[in-house]
């Protein structure tokens, strides 16, 4: 239910240029004929979209008449929807400015709550990120402590990253088959920071960027905030369609392409070598910068770990390939250390841009990362074996409690991309929370409205017993009366 919020002054005015079209919004909403009363059903769905970030805050909503036409309902119904949103704090209106989205007092956007985790006893399957064994962290801190004495007398600013860490990351690339110099490495505060720096330097508002669909939501949000136009290429149950990738690069000529070829998030798929080669060649012909997200590349569970994407380029052909990596998925997200590999000249420009925002990363975190990378030969095999056990436990629990769901066991990564067989994922995610499980609807990973409502991303990063309990709770939630969303059956809005 949409609960009424205490009266308060109208929220901040809508952001100029940030609007939600009637057809775009209709593609995200359920069929108003699917429940009674329709206005309350639509208001609940709309508040959920605002809360989880699929509709931006302070964005202008369509006029009542336009939305009524797009949904095939009466204007009276939409008027009641907007009234209920205003009463509950999810919208505000002003003469001449229309109606725009907001959050009630005390509510946190789910983009933030996904990261900080549940503040209750719910099982958290919204974050595909493992924890770090306590003793591993304690031992690493013990080793790092004496090294801090060397750095304490210095200012501590390293916009390029600690020289030793840059060298270690470069050596890691070289060992994996891509000769790399320390000058080609920029240490960042995580992979997301690396992507944001690249976008800020190479792109301008309105530029086109090729992305996979589905893709990593935080990357899509970074592109949206930079006012870039995404052009999506599908990742289906059969993997990537290289012909669509080639034709998109040839016809659209995007400024940048963001790809996750190694145990793709959320599907877990691994791009074959021949498709990597063809992608590199097509990007070289179009002059497109390739940004390759390798944060999951080490998490190979059933196959050998893949070599770097850029290693498949022709000699001298890696000039427009940027590779992003991180400690978050292999070690711990609390260690805010990532990196990018790029031509040395570009690294210099990126470091210059970085100084305007954060001056450089934490010396302590970088020393910890250096210590953990040196121990990766011992730590990583244990991590992989743990993930294999947990993946098997999740698959067995799904087969037992939800046999109607289907999935493909990924060769690596951190999650299953589960097909529910009907577009109820968002409704199930809401109902599962009532049963004590936080889970992500596939729609959160979509580049276009109305897609992947039949999918859930279920990580296997928590203990096996917890996964089994979570699946049992989801099965109980599934037995409830879920309203089937009709968005997948409507033509989705296209920019």
Q: Where are these predicted regions, by residue range?
A:
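Hydrophobic residues in well-ordered beta-strands that form the structural core
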Residues: 211, 232, 292, 439-441
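Conserved glycine-rich beta-strand-loop-beta hairpin in the small C-terminal domain of fold type I
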Residues: 387-395, 405-419
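Structural signature of PLP-dependent enzymes
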Residues: 153, 350-357, 372-395
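Conserved core of the PLP fold type I
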Residues: 152-287, 298-316, 481-495
């Amino acid at each position: 239910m949409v609960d009424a919020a205490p009266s308060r002054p109208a929220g901040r005015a809508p952001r100029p240029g940030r609007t939600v079209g009637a057809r775009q919004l209709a593609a995200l909403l359920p069929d108003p004929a699917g429940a009674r009363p329709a206005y309350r059903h639509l208001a609940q769905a709309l508040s959920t979209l605002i809360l989880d970030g699929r509709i931006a805050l302070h964005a202008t909503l369509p006029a009542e008449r336009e939305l009524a036409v797009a949904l095939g309902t009466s204007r009276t119904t939409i008027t009641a929807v907007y009234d209920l949103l205003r009463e509950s704090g999810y919208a505000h209106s002003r003469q001449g400015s229309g109606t725009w989205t907001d959050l009630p007092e005390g509510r946190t956007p789910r983009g933030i709550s996904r990261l900080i985790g549940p503040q209750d006893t719910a099982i958290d399957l919204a974050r595909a990120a493992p924890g770090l064994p306590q003793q591993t962290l304690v031992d690493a801190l013990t080793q790092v402590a004496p090294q801090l004495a060397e750095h304490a007398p210095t200012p501590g600013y390293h916009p390029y990253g600690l020289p030793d860490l840059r060298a270690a990351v470069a050596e890691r690339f070289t060992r994996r088959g891509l000769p790399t110099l320390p000058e080609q490495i920029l240490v960042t505060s995580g992979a997301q920071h690396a992507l944001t720096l690249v976008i800020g330097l190479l792109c301008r508002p309105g530029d086109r960027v090729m992305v996979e669909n589905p893709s990593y939501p935080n990357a899509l949000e970074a592109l949206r905030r930079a006012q870039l136009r995404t052009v999506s290429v599908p990742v289906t149950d059969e993997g990537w369609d290289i012909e669509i990738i080639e034709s998109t690069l040839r016809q659209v000529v995007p400024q940048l392409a963001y790809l996750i070829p190694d145990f793709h998030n959320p599907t877990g798929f691994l791009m074959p070598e021949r498709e990597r080669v063809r992608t590199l060649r097509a990007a070289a012909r179009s002059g497109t910068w390739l940004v390759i997200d390798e944060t999951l590349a080490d998490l190979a569970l059933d196959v050998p770990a893949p070599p770097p994407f850029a290693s498949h380029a022709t000699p001298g052909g890696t000039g427009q390939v940027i590779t992003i990596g991180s400690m978050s998925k292999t070690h711990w997200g609390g260690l805010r250390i990532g990196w990018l590999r790029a031509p040395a000249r570009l690294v210099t420009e990126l470091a210059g841009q970085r100084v305007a925002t954060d001056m450089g990363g934490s010396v302590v975190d970088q020393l910890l990362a250096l210590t953990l990378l040196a121990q990766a030969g011992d730590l990583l095999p244990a991590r992989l074996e743990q993930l294999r056990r947990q993946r098997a436990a999740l698959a067995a629990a799904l087969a037992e409690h939800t046999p109607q769901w289907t999935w493909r066991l990924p060769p690596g990564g951190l999650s299953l991309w589960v097909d529910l067989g009907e577009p109820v994922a968002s409704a199930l995610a809401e109902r599962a929370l009532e049963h004590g499980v936080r889970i992500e609807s596939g729609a959160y990973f979509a580049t276009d409205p109305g897609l992947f409502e039949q999918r859930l991303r279920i990580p296997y990063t928590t203990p096996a017993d917890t996964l089994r309990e979570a699946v049992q709770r989801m099965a109980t939630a599934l037995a409830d009366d879920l309203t089937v969303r009709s968005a997948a059956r409507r033509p989705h809005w296209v920019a």
